[in-house]
């Protein structure tokens, strides 16, 4: 195709050359006038060609332009026909072709100079159109050659040459266009540039024609002269071709660079002259009715100037403050860019100011102020200022981390952005070996891990990255990082932290690091041994966000790549007002509509106020409806639905933690919290027995959301006042429920100030509630720790109602109440107060009424107890007078008579309860009433100080010591008789009458102890604390005596196994008797027959052995003696039993208890009820 085109174009080029030559001759003859006309005509031709190029460029654009814009663009370029009418692209091309054909058909008449000029113009136009058609053909050929990928060098060189010609042609057109606009260039320069472009075009065409001819000639010559061509020549041609290509590309690049500013200038002037076209191009619309004039009419010139000033790089900083305020006051339209830029600058200043004021005490207040402003719009500025402030003052890192934790709980995207920027900052500093930036950024990340904003995996990744390449700086950064977040990491993943410490230990053993860094590693190990005491994860004052409310971000070092720095810059918002209103509504929900700035607590108080205000509004609306006469639904369907959902969740969950999570997801309002707590308590009270599930659940809920603590406190106070409305089962469950809450510190111990324990306000239901409540606390804590807790200074004012100190009557009542429950050790301080207090009338009625309320005995029993006490007082007085009788016989007779009366009066009816705890309570009552039991003494001595004994013990001990003085003196006198004969006689008489005397002595001691206990009850208030040392001495004597008694009693208790031993001996004797008879008969038969005796010695020799025979009379005598002994023993036992009034089983238990538990003995037999005291 190219060859044929070239051949066809060869003859066409001849007349053009001829005409040009003829024109030149004519011009030379005519002179200057002809030359001027030639240049004018040539200029018009160039402009007409530029017109077509501009039209092509405009129509090939990605967006459409209206016809009016096209007309204005092509106004300065005259058409070939001289008309300014616009035609489509195809029509213009057809007209051009017709014009050329017409010019070729008609003969040219070269008569005058003007006609010659016309012909030259026509020939030039023809060549211009041919060039355009050639460009189109060459572009098509180029695309075809790329698809087929021809390897022939001639074709490649041809395509490159065509491309060069096209690029040069376009640059020449652009230059001509610039000259047409007239930017101050001379006419000479423009003419020169046109002539240059012509020459270049002609050279290219000649070159292309030569290349075509060469290619044909080479084919022809190659048949003859193939060996003359060398590969070296081909390579040189290729190199030349590559050089030309590089030079042409460089030329194009330089030309484009030079033309860029000129283009920009032309474009600006063009758009200034044609505003409508520029507006359409910016919008990307083709045929819109709206014009730029209407849009620009809204913005005044003054506002445009202020916008330019405020949106500049300085941001209006070069202006004076007064002028800047004036400019800002003039701008009132919120949708304008100027107003938004001013608002952004103000937000930036607020954020910087608040962050610079942050400290430990003002974190919550400043975060509330920050949340009032639109920090979602200024999140980039907020994160940048926080990071900058932390870098300048690393000592406040934990404060900034607490503030970020609060913001992250409400806006997690802000926390994520800040964490991403910190990670990217750390990675850049680690790559650049910037130690200071690494330290600050890692320090901040560690505190964010402590605040649960960042996941612990990020911390472990940073540690592994630092320790993998153990340099001095890396290990130092890792140590500081571990110190800050080591406590948190050991709680969450102790195994992985242990692995990191092992790596540090290996690095330390290698010894390649600096001594300073090695010492730092040793210090870190010491800190770990101490449990990170000096480096706590979160300070109590900065633990402002609950665990369930925090949003933890799981980021990895590899994933974080983009810091979103665009958010730091100003961006125009089309929906500025709507977005601001949305944020205001959101901030009201977070902070509360009536929240004050000075409120330190974050979240809970504001939410509660808003919820309460909503509830009040609802109540007012209901009242208005009721007054208006509308029907109101009082069935409360919402409350019933809430109860149903809570009850179903409680029964459906397996674990209390799962149940707590489900209940907290319900997002209850503050007005619903009281109802929620009441439902929990009702579910716990309705159970048959107390279940720990409800106590653990409430403890978990109170720790997760502290707003539930106050409702439970109020419920406890209401129950203490309304215990009479509840039955015993519900009272026990509720008391154990609240005891669990106090033990776990879910609610504070200040609640106990509502309980008042006095004789006037004592009710049976309240006493039962207090009893089960305190017993449950003692089971959880233990008596020692419970007493220690009650003696703290914090609870001194709250326990004034339970342990009163104002009135001795109330003091006695509380002492008697707690001793009856079995918690007498709590009232030691009150007992000491009573010793110092003045004397008052004994309150026997108060103690009797309390015992009647708790144990519920009949009135007859209480009257019998009072009579017994009076009788015992009279007997004790007589006993004191008759301590030193002249004869033993009179003494024993009186004691035996008194023991019978004591045994009858000591019978007490046992109380039967459903629970097993009733028997324990009775046993504790018996111990507390006696006050001489060794078990309680041992407990009190172990738990409390040795000097703190009860007042009743000291009084009883002092009285008993005085009574026993006379006896001890007589015993010492009787131990030293004058003659040995008298000693032996007395011993024999004592051995015969040992059992009777032992029983008499024992009974006397019991009578004395019972009388002393009755006296101690009356005189316990007037005892003194000076007899404590004497009590200790007495105890030592009593223990020595009790040991001797135990040995004697053990010997007497051997009769229990005697019957079994006798049976065994009888069997042995029967066997012994039977065997000798057999041997005897056998030997007699052998002797009769004359055979020798079958018995043998030890050496195997037979011998005649005579069997020893017993006489029957001797055997009978021994049996009779044995029977007598047995009868005497049984007679003595029966005699003792008859005196004591016990059955055989009770007597056996009595003897065993005297050996093992000499303090007390309580009979468990159903027939009789008897208690013994040692």
From Swiss-Prot:
Low complexity composition bias: residue spans: 16-35, 138-153, 597-608, 840-857, 926-957, 1010-1020
Assigned keywords, A-Z: Differentiation, mRNA processing, mRNA splicing, Nucleus, Sexual differentiation
GO biological process: cell differentiation; male sex determination; male sex differentiation; mRNA splicing, via spliceosome; regulation of mRNA splicing, via spliceosome
InterPro entries hit by this protein: ARM-type_fold, CWC22_splicing_factor, Initiation_fac_eIF4g_MI, MIF4G-like_typ-3
UniProt-listed SUPFAM superfamilies: ARM repeat (SSF48371)
Record keyword Nucleotide-binding present: no
Biased composition (Basic residues): 201-223, 869-909, 963-1001, 1034-1045, 1119-1130
Any one GO MF annotation of this record: RNA binding
One Gene Ontology cellular component annotation held by this UniProt entry: nuclear speck
Location(s), subcellular: Nucleus speckle
Domain called MI: residue spans: 641-757
Residue segments, region Disordered: 1-51, 80-109, 136-259, 597-616, 840-1045, 1095-1133
Keyword Nucleus (UniProt): yes
MIF4G domain location: 348-531
UniProt biased composition (Basic and acidic residues): 1-15, 80-92, 183-200, 235-259, 910-924, 1095-1118
Family: Belongs to the CWC22 family.
Subunit structure: Component of the spliceosome C complex.
Note: The M.domestica genome only codes for one male determiner Mdmd protein, which is encoded in the M region, and can be located at different loci on the genome (chromosomes II, III, V or Y). The M region contains a cluster of tandemly repeated Mdmd copies with only one intact copy: other copies are degenerate with large truncations and frameshifts and are assumed to be non-functional. The presence of multiple copies in the M region may preserve its integrity in a hostile non-recombining environment. This protein is encoded on chromosome II.
Protein task: Male determiner protein (M-factor) that controls male somatic sexual differentiation. Acts as a dominant factor that regulates the mRNA splicing of transformer (tra) and doublesex (dsx) transcripts and promotes expression of male splice forms of tra and dsx. Probably acts as a component of the spliceosome C complex required for mRNA splicing factor and exon-junction complex (EJC) assembly. Hinders eIF4AIII from non-specifically binding RNA and escorts it to the splicing machinery to promote EJC assembly on mature mRNAs.
Protein's recorded name: Male determiner protein Mdmd(II)
Species lineage: Eukaryota, Metazoa, Ecdysozoa, Arthropoda, Hexapoda
């Amino acid at each position: 195709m190219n060859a044929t085109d070239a051949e066809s174009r060869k003859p066409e080029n001849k007349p053009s050359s001829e005409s040009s030559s003829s024109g030149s001759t004519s011009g030379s003859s005519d002179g200057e006038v002809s030359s001027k006309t030639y240049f004018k005509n040539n200029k018009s031709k160039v402009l007409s060609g530029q017109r077509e190029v501009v039209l092509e460029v405009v129509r090939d654009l990605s967006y459409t332009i209206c016809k009016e814009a096209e007309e204005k663009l092509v106004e300065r370029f005259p058409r070939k026909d001289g008309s300014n009418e616009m035609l489509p692209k195809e029509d213009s091309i057809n007209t051009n072709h017709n014009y050329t054909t017409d010019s070729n058909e008609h003969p040219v008449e070269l008569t005058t100079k003007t006609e010659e000029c016309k012909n030259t113009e026509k020939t030039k136009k023809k060549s211009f159109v041919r060039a355009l058609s050639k460009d189109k053909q060459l572009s098509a050929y180029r695309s075809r050659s790329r698809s087929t990928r021809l390897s022939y060098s001639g074709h490649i060189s041809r395509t490159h040459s065509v491309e060069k010609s096209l690029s040069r042609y376009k640059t020449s057109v652009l230059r001509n266009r610039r000259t047409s606009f007239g930017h101050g260039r001379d006419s000479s320069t423009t003419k020169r540039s046109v002539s240059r472009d012509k020459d270049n075009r002609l050279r290219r065409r000649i070159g292309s024609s030569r290349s075509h001819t060469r290619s044909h000639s080479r084919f022809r010559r190659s048949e003859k002269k193939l060996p003359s061509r060398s590969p070296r020549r081909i390579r040189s041609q290729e190199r030349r071709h590559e050089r030309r290509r590089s030079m042409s590309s460089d030329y194009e690049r330089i030309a484009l660079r030079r033309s860029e500013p000129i283009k920009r200038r032309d474009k600006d002037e063009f758009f200034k002259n044609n505003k409508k076209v520029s507006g359409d191009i910016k919008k990307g619309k083709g045929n819109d009715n709206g014009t730029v004039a209407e849009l620009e009419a809204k913005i005044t010139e003054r506002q445009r100037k202020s916008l330019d000033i405020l949106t500049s790089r300085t941001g209006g900083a070069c202006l004076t403050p007064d002028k800047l305020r004036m400019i800002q006051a003039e701008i009132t339209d919120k949708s304008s860019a100027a107003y938004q830029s001013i608002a952004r600058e103000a937000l930036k200043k607020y954020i910087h100011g608040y962050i610079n004021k942050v400290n430990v005490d003002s974190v919550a207040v400043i975060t509330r102020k920050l949340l009032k402003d639109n920090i979602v719009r200024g999140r980039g500025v907020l994160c940048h200022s926080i990071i900058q402030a932390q870098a300048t003052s690393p000592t406040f890192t934990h404060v900034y981390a607490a503030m970020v934790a609060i913001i992250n709980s409400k806006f997690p995207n802000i926390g994520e952005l800040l964490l991403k920027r910190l990670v990217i900052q750390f990675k850049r500093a680690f790559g650049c070996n910037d130690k200071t930036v690494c330290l600050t950024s890692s320090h901040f990340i560690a505190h964010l891990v402590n605040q649960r904003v960042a996941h612990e995996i990020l911390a472990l990744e940073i540690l592994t990255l630092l320790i993998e390449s153990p340099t001095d700086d890396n290990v130092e950064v890792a140590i500081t990082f571990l110190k800050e977040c080591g406590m948190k990491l050991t709680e969450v993943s102790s195994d992985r932290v242990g692995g990191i410490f092992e790596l540090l230990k290996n690095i330390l053993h290698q010894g390649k690091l600096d001594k300073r860094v090695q010492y730092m590693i040793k210090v870190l190990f010491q800190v770990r041994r101490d449990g990170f005491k000096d480096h706590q994860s979160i300070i109590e004052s900065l633990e402002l966000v609950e665990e369930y409310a925090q949003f933890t971000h799981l980021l990895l070092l590899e994933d974080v790549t983009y810091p979103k720095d665009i958010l730091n810059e100003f961006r125009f918002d089309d929906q500025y007002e709507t977005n601001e209103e949305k944020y205001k509504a959101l901030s009201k929900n977070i902070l509360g509509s009536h929240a004050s700035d000075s409120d330190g607590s974050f979240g809970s108080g504001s939410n509660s106020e808003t919820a309460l205000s909503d509830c009040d509004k609802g109540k007012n609306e209901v009242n208005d409806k009721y007054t208006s006469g509308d029907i109101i639904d009082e069935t409360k369907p919402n409350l019933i639905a809430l109860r149903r959902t809570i009850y179903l969740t409680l029964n459906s969950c397996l674990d209390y933690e799962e149940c707590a999570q489900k209940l907290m997801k319900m997002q209850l309002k503050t007005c619903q919290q009281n109802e929620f707590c009441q439902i929990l308590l009702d579910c716990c009270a309705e159970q048959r027995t107390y279940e720990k599930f409800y106590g653990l659940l409430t403890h978990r809920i109170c720790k997760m959301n502290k707003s539930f603590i106050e409702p439970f406190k109020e419920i406890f106070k209401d129950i203490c006042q309304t215990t009479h409305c509840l039955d015993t089962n519900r009272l026990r469950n509720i008391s154990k429920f609240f005891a669990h809450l106090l033990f776990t510190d879910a609610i504070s111990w200040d609640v106990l100030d509502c309980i008042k324990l006095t004789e006037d306000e004592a009710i049976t239901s309240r006493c039962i509630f207090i009893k089960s409540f305190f017993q449950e606390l003692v089971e959880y804590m233990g008596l020692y720790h419970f007493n220690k807790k009650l003696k703290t200074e914090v609870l001194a004012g709250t326990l004034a109602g339970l342990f009163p100190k104002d009135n001795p009557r109330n003091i006695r009542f509380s002492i008697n109440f707690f001793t009856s429950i079995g918690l007498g050790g709590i009232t030691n301080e009150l007992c000491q107060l009573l010793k110092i207090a003045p004397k008052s009338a004994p309150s026997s009625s108060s103690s009797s009424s309390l015992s009647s309320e708790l144990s519920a005995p009949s009135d007859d029993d209480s009257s019998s107890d009072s009579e017994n006490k009076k009788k015992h007082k009279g007997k004790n007085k007589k006993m004191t007078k008759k301590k030193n009788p002249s004869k033993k016989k009179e003494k024993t007779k009186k004691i035996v008579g008194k023991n019978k009366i004591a045994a009858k009066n000591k019978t007490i009816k046992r109380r039967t309860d459903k629970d097993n705890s009733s028997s324990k309570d009775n046993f504790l009552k018996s111990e507390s009433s006696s006050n001489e039991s060794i078990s309680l003494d041992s407990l009190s001595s172990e738990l409390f100080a040795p000097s703190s004994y009860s007042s009743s013990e000291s009084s009883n001990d002092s009285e008993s010591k005085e009574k026993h003085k006379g006896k001890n003196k007589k015993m010492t006198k009787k131990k030293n008789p004058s003659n040995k004969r008298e000693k032996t006689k007395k011993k024999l008489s004592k051995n015969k009458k040992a059992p009777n005397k032992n029983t008499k002595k024992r009974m006397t001691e019991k009578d004395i102890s019972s009388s002393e206990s009755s006296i101690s009850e009356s005189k316990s208030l007037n005892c003194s604390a000076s007899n404590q040392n004497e009590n200790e001495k007495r105890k030592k004597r009593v223990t020595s005596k009790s040991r001797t008694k135990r040995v004697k009693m053990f010997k007497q208790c051997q009769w229990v196994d005697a019957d079994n031993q006798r049976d065994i001996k009888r069997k042995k004797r029967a066997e012994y008797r039977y065997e000798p008879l057999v041997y005897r008969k056998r030997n007699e038969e052998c002797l009769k027959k004359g055979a020798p005796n079958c018995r043998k010695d030890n050496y195997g020799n037979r011998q005649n052995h005579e069997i020893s025979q017993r006489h029957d009379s001797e055997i009978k005598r021994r049996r009779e003696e044995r029977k007598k002994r047995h009868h005497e023993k049984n007679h003595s036992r029966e005699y003792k039993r008859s005196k004591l009034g016990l059955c055989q089983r009770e007597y056996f238990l009595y003897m065993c208890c005297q050996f093992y538990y000499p303090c007390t003995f309580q009979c468990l037999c159903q027939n009789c009820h008897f208690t013994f005291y040692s």
